[in-house]
Amino acid sequence: EKHWRTYAFEYLLREEEFKIQARELLTAYHQYIQDHPPQVVARERKFSFTIDELQVMISGKIDRIDQEGDRLAVVDYKTSKNKEKAKGSLQLALYTEALKRDAVEGVSGKPGSTILHFLRHPDDPLESHVFDTADLDKQMEKVTAVSAGIRKYEFPTKPGDFICRNCDYREFLCPAWEEN
């Protein structure tokens, strides 16, 4: 209760709905942790590393790092309703790369599994993957492509109902929306 931010909500009814959902998610998560206690090494840990050949700095924050045998597991919490695969996650690949490079503040060890913990799926909350060298190389190709696009000021639109539905420019300025 003391950390709840009432001012973040425009409408009282919406705040009450979110508060109920938050309580349900936290209750289910607490039960899951009681049933499956992790060996937590760190929480909310910053990392930063440079990909020299691209002159690109990657930085971020890892939600949780656990000890799993002689390896470190990265856990990223998700509140989305839809589950996604850990295998194709660029985010998790970059977390693995940060551990490989010893770039996580106050944490060192060999990377192991990466885990997406879906809080809205208490019966089956985890989606995990261990990134091997080939997986990491594939994900780093994405970083290379994105950084090249940024340097060329190329930001291609990706129109779609989910992305575009709240866009103020959709109806009168967006040629990509018109084509779609």
Protein language model annotation of sequence segments:
Residues A42-A103, K142:
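Non-catalytic protein-protein interaction segments used by genome-maintenance enzymes to assemble
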Residues H3-L13, A73-N82, E127-S128, Y153:
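Glycine- and acidic
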